[in-house]
UniProtKB/Swiss-Prot annotation:
Regions that span the bilayer: none
Pathway: Nucleotide-sugar biosynthesis; CMP-3-deoxy-D-manno-octulosonate biosynthesis; CMP-3-deoxy-D-manno-octulosonate from 3-deoxy-D-manno-octulosonate and CTP: step 1/1; Bacterial outer membrane biogenesis; lipopolysaccharide biosynthesis
KW Lipoprotein (keyword) present: no
Compartments it resides in: Cytoplasm
Protein's UniProt name: 3-deoxy-manno-octulosonate cytidylyltransferase
UniProt-listed CDD domains: CMP-KDO-Synthetase
InterPro entries: Cytidylyl_trans (IPR003329), KdsB (IPR004528), Nucleotide-diphossugar_trans (IPR029044)
UniProt GO cellular component terms: cytosol
Entry similarity comment: Belongs to the KdsB family.
Length: 256
């Protein structure tokens, strides 16, 4: 199947400035992400950046790059600009991979594109089971709840669903004894969309729920669209948000 991967790569990260160019095993981080996207079988891979040094690095390893505005409020707005500039057809499948995911498994890149095509929705994504109590209660871990057919009911940083009886009985001191049931899933931040839908998305105003949770995908649900979720065939390793994350990834890739 045909699909295009777009990799937004912002240089001005608040927690780790310049991270697309951070050296990992002799290559800039953005090159590792690009290579994983290439291995997925994508028809086309484009790096979207607002910084000339990142663009120069991408051209240096023969990657395709699209320069974008530095004024975007979200990664989705950056995607919309790329789609407009490259005149991508409305029915083209677009997979969005974050530029700080150098360990993303290529198999899940193709999986999310197939998920979109199979279920005939405008947006699809992936999740993995939560099996750790600390992860469940961590607000930096986004939880996703679906119906019986895998369509999203809600995304939240809070624990959903709330297991009233078990949580009340155990209390905070005994959370380690929780029996995590099969409905707890961690959302993986990889998306597939139709190009035309991305253009529609950026026409919608930000919504109350997305501003409260700081989760822009809630804008899709707010406007009545469906998102389909599948369990990822392979759980992705750590992304790079901090210096500590970067060192972990360097350690992993130094042994490959």
């Amino acid at each position: 199947m045909n699909f295009t991967v777009i990799i937004p790569a912002r240089y001005a990260s608040s927690r780790l400035p310049g991270k697309p160019l951070a050296d990992i095993a002799g290559k800039p981080m953005i090159q590792h992400v690009w290579e994983k996207a290439q291995q997925s079988g994508a028809t086309r891979v484009v790096v979207a950046t607002d910084y000339e040094e990142v663009a120069r690095a991408v051209r240096g390893f023969d990657g395709e790059v699209c320069m974008t505005s530095s004024q975007h409020n979200s990664g989705t707005e950056r995607l919309a600009e790329v789609i407009e500039k490259l005149a991508v057809p409305d029915d083209e499948i677009i997979v969005n991979i974050q530029g700080d995911e150098p360990l993303i498994p290529p198999v899940i890149v193709s999986q999310v594109a197939q998920n979109l095509q199979k279920y005939q929705v405008n947006m699809a994504t992936l999740a993995v089971k939560i099996e750790d109590v600390e992860e469940l209660f961590n607000p930096n871990v986004v939880k996703v709840l679906t119906d019986k057919d895998g369509y999203v009911l809600y995304f939240s940083r809070a624990v959903i669903p709330w297991d009233r009886d078990q949580f009340v009985q155990l209390g905070k001191a005994d959370l380690s004894q929780l029996q995590l049931h099969q409905h707890y899933f961690r959302h993986i931040g990889i998306y597939a969309y139709r190009a035309g839908f991305i253009k529609q998305y950026v026409q919608w105003q930000p919504t109350t729920l997305e501003q409260i949770e700081r989760l822009e995908q809630l804008r899709v649900l707010w406007n009545g669209e469906r998102i389909h979720v599948e369990l990822a065939k392979q759980a992705p390793a750590v992304g790079v948000d901090t210096v500590e994350d970067l060192e972990k990834v360097r350690s992993i890739l130094s042994h490959v």
